[in-house]
Amino acid sequence: MTQACEEVGPDKVHKRVRRLIAGDRLHLTKGDYKKPIVLSSLSGAEDSPIVLTGTDAVLGTKLKFKKYQATGNALAAAQEAGGEFPGLYYLADNAVLVLRNCQWITIEKLSFDGCWPTAVYLENCQHITLRGLKINGGTFAIGATGVTTRHILVEDCDWVQDPSGNGWELCDALRAGKTIEKELDGPPSKLWRDIDWVEVHGDWLENGKRVDIEHDARAYDGDFFRAWSIAGYVVIRNNIIADAFNGVHFFNQVAESIIDSCSRNVLIEGNWFIRIRDNAIEPEHYAWNWTVRHNVIVDCYLPFSLQMARSGYFYIYGNVAWNVGKPGPDKDEHTRGQFFKFPTDHYADGPHYVFNNSWVLRAPLVKKMRFSNFVHVNNAIDYSDSDPDVTAPFGGNFRDAAPAGYQMEAALLFEAKHFTKAWQYLGIQFDGDVIHHPTFPNDVNAAGFPLGAASLGVSPAFSDMAPGRPDGLKPLTHHPAVDLTLLLPNGDKVTATQAQQNQVGAWQGSDLIKVEDPIFWTYWPGKQDAREVT
């Protein structure tokens, strides 16, 4: 459907947006839009959304991090002084573009520069599309809050949180359809190379550190997409997040009576996460029915943080990753990490499948804690670091004996520094994985981790392990997959892999492994219309 387009400049946009109705298409003309734009209680329709666009419009003050650094640190210190974790999270609603109580709105092809702390903020909104945005700097690229916030589509957006390196060159190359081996050899950002992790996210309880107003970098402690207790139905696809602290981060801290109605139905697919200083994917507290597929991760301290109290029905497959670069200055103690971060205790409402992914790592898969109903099968893993102690799949201390009898108190004390060995009790399965490590599978099995019989300790024979080329992780050797059937939240089952048809790893011939779309994405309201509007 083609919509008539009205043009407006920085001097009149604030009055004009108040009168938008279904079917309006407002084009922001070339210029700098420094004052916040607020869309409040506006409703488009499924077949005629309100569209806000403008290829040459720049929203934000263009404030550089260095100019905001002390302010951000002081605001974090104020939070710390009140007994809270030091951060700018409580100020995320201070955004350049705010949508409040809105439905059926598309924001596309806008640029944001120097929006501290937030570029786009959604509050109690439904059916919002954010497409083709370019966001430079900021603590939060996109923030979302409200238990009625749902059906949010974020696609084809680029965010470089710290542009002091060549992050935008990486984005430009990828958008041009190029590989990025050359760009990855270019200068990384100060956030990746020079800033200590604790200067961004350290606190007194965990790290013995108070906020240093002059030297810290608390304004970087944010995310590409941060959700505070929203209903869900979120799709984040085909975005590029480079030189940032975090990628996608959900909280679910609502009252117990409505916990189950938040952080549900999330699809994260086809994104690039490049030089992420903390986590790429991080659902916290409670979450259900997440699909994470076909993403590319290039250097991330800790890609998957799954520190949830209760969750279920996670499907993580077809992703490729290289963790080969060491972040931070020499004194930084947060440089190696692990691939999965687990909680102290966890209850599973359903399975969590991690299958047919391809990784090149310099750290363990998981070093400590526990997780319930975790199924890790058919993954292909090689290493960029030759030291077997620091890359041992379950941590260098995996041979330590678990306490006799494994009573809960003793178990949790042991697991504070070790990956759990209570696999049968927790429903943990590792099978069909090809992991190129000298301790795998024999030494790992002997240490009390009951790996499946199809686990192999050989090279997956990736054709090219150089970072940045996803097809380089196609294997030269065929290793048959083990059969895997997925349980869906509604009780249905779907075949994911069959030994006679599939191989280990993300690549199945010339394509990444495919499984049926989540039902909520198949029947996404306005899905076809959204494509026609662009």
What do these predicted regions represent?
Residues 4-11, 25-30, 34-36, 43-116, ...:
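Right-handed parallel beta-helix/beta-spiral solenoid domain characteristic of secreted/periplasmic
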Residues 27, 69-84, 172-223, 372-534:
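Acidic, glycine- and Ser/Thr-rich low-complexity intrinsically disordered tracts
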